[in-house]
Amino acid sequence: MFRGATLVNLDSKGRLSVPTRYREQLLENAAGQMVCTIDIHHPCLLLYPLPEWEIIEQKLPRLSSMNPVERRVQRLLLGHASECQMDGAGRLLIAPVLRQHAGLTKEVMLVGQFNKFELWDETTWHQQVKEDIDAEQLATGDLSERLQDLSL
């Protein structure tokens, strides 16, 4: 399980250094093989260990190519999916087209989200967090049953 938000830097070649606390887990569970794709709802990237991505990849063909929304999801997720292998120094090369999509330049937030990571431009990440907190403070609607069961 991946959790927490960590500031990492992209080098001049577009590589990010995976924090040490995740490297062993990624090597053990995925042999350092990762898949990166776009998030279809936010200006960030999704970074999956290969076994986690394969679960999603098995579900994508079940979507109907005749349904425009389902076909769009297939096209966006699979069409942007790019494999990346962690090198001996614990770095991952993020494809240029993906970096451009998320506006990633130098300072990147690596955000653990259970079975995957999100990659955000640092400034965009902080703006998103502020928007999310502001939205929660203004929310007056009823909580879903799942949120009601989540006691913090």
Curated annotation (Swiss-Prot):
Keywords: Cytoplasm, DNA-binding, Repeat, Repressor, Transcription, Transcription regulation. It is found in: Cytoplasm, Nucleoid. SUPFAM superfamilies: AbrB/MazE/MraZ-like (SSF89447). InterPro entries: MraZ (IPR003444), MraZ_C (IPR035644), MraZ_dom (IPR020603), MraZ_N (IPR035642), MraZ_sf (IPR038619), SpoVT-AbrB_dom (IPR007159), SpoVT-AbrB_sf (IPR037914). GO terms for biological process: negative regulation of DNA-templated transcription initiation. PROSITE patterns: SPOVT_ABRB (PS51740). Pfam families: MraZ. NCBIfam families: division/cell wall cluster transcriptional repressor MraZ (TIGR00242). Negatively regulates its own expression and that of the subsequent genes in the proximal part of the division and cell wall (dcw) gene cluster. Acts by binding directly to DNA. May also regulate the expression of genes outside the dcw cluster. Belongs to the MraZ family. This is Transcriptional regulator MraZ. It comes from Shigella dysenteriae serotype 1 (strain Sd197). The lineage of its organism: Bacteria, Pseudomonadati, Pseudomonadota, Gammaproteobacteria, Enterobacterales. The gene is mraZ.
